[in-house]
UniProtKB/Swiss-Prot annotation:
Species for this entry: Xenopus tropicalis (Western clawed frog)
Residues making up the propeptide: 19-274
Protein's recorded name: Nodal homolog 3-B
Expressing tissues: Expressed in the dorsal marginal region of late blastula, becoming restricted to the Spemann organizer at the early gastrula stage.
Keyword Signal carried by entry: yes
Span of the signal peptide: 1-18
Domain remark in the UniProt entry: The propeptide region is both necessary and sufficient for bmp-inhibitory activity. The propeptide region and the N- and C-terminal thirds of the mature protein are necessary for neural induction activity. Although cleavage doesn't appear essential for activity, residues surrounding the cleavage site are necessary for activity.
Amino acid sequence: MAFLSLFLCLVFSSPLMAMPPALQGRKAISPASILKGPSTDNGARDFHGRKFPHFMMQLYQNIISRRDKDLSNLEHPTLQESDTVQSFIAKSYTTVGNHWTLFFDMSSISTNNELKLAELRICLPSFGKSHSVTVEIYHTKDTKEKLFMGSFKTKISSALDADCKVFNLTMVLHNYLIRGKRLIKDEYIQAKGLLLRDLEKSAAEKGAENVDTLKQDKHHVSDFAAERIILVVFAKERSQAKPDPPSLGKQLFPLKYGMADNANKVNGFRRLRRNKKEKTRMDVGTTPPKPVEEIKPKCRKVDMFVDFQKIGWGSWIVYPKAYNAYRCESACAVPLNETDDATNYSYIKSLLPLSDTERRECPSCVPVKMRSMSMLYYENEEFILRHHEEMIVEECGFKDI
């Protein structure tokens, strides 16, 4: 699964343009990679005292193990079109009778990304009779300022299975982020699971707590929200006029690297392609001296292990802690032969007289095919899953720079 070409489910994919000022904030930068890692009984592992959202860990496991069948009908196609998955753990919540209010800090949703899918996932034990619940979604950076995003109604009933209840909030986020409108809709979506706790209060209880039932106990909210209430946003970085793969360095150090305009780059000459079916000898006037028969080192791929801890990125990278990026190496082997993976220019240049040291240049042994890598990292109290292009060398070849 050429994942992301990688990441996430597609439901609604209108471009994410201007973001309301109330949602503008820090940018989602820094990427980190993920390798398969051990999980605890509840499906999460501690990282700087934080628990991984179970869904994010499960999603990563599905990606690296290519388990397409474990993804929903929405998540599978979106994963093919997205390159970033962000998870937002609920900062707090209130429950008054059949009225649910959830608060998230969505400041890091980038205006450079195209929204693909937004899912609200709630996993609570269920009991009681079937009843309707109104759910309101708010954006908040602190408890003082709260921005209403939208609401929907859904029917809650008891269930025996262990699935979480999943709501598609793509329209809610899109409607507000793009148009600045709140979305209030009944029967918004048919949920995937049926496992919300029946928190309906008695009439006496409702009257007693008419004011504010915000859960203030931090330990309770943290434990509850980390595994129970999570907003997952699937997105793709908006392509530029002349698209280039997103740079890991530019995302890590945006102030250090300028976003140069590549539109005026001169296109390289289209190189001639040799007819490999017919071995045609080229007449260069003078036959170059035959080299001494010896085993010349080819342009080859060798190991290059990257340890994120050693380069100072270990504090926020979740998976992998290290990986083999590989590199290309070769001695200066001239003239090249037809079996070498080289450009026509490199081949012609290597036929120059070996005695002409001033005109003799060694072709560069460089990566000619790269592979992407999925990465999981912890940034600004959020777990982010991102797909980065050109992270691992697949093939090496001779090339003139």
